[in-house]
Amino acid sequence: MKEYKGRIILPANAPSGRAQKIVIEVRDVSLADAPSILIAEEQLHDIMLAPNKKIEFKIRVPEVTSKQSLSFRVHISKDSDDHVKSGDLLTTISYPVPSDTRPVIELPVVVV
């Protein structure tokens, strides 16, 4: 297992208030024509949100083969619903998981 440390970066237009659930996932995105596969997940609960805030996290990721490509995904929900809806915050581009755990990962999200 590897442990990654990171920060979720909220945008200037992020809502204030509490997020009931923040889900940080690592997904296997190796296959272009297939759904990604969940490899690791960490959840944070009852976290204060504010514009430009940075939210610290840690996630443990199992070792994978060199043929696998992993990517981070973040979903912030104010009401703990797993379905993405208007007002949630998400990563919207690919953030590859580095092979080295030393750098702190920064994951910007946008309001949807």
Where are these regions (language model features)?
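Short, ordered, surface-exposed loop/turn motifs in non-cytosolic proteins
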Residues: 15-24, 32-33
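Extracellular beta-sheet/turn segments enriched in Thr/Pro/Gly and aliphatic residues
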Residues: 95-112
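Short acidic/polar inter-strand loop motif in beta-rich domains
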Residues: 75-90
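A short, amphipathic beta-strand motif
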Residues: 4-11
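Beta-strand signatures of extracellular beta-sandwich domains
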Residues: 23-27, 71-75
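Local beta-strand/beta-hairpin segments that build beta-sheet-rich folds
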Residues: 34-41, 86-90
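A short beta-turn/strand-edge loop motif at beta-sheet boundaries
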Residues: 12-19, 64-67
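A beta-strand/beta-hairpin structural motif
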Residues: 40-63
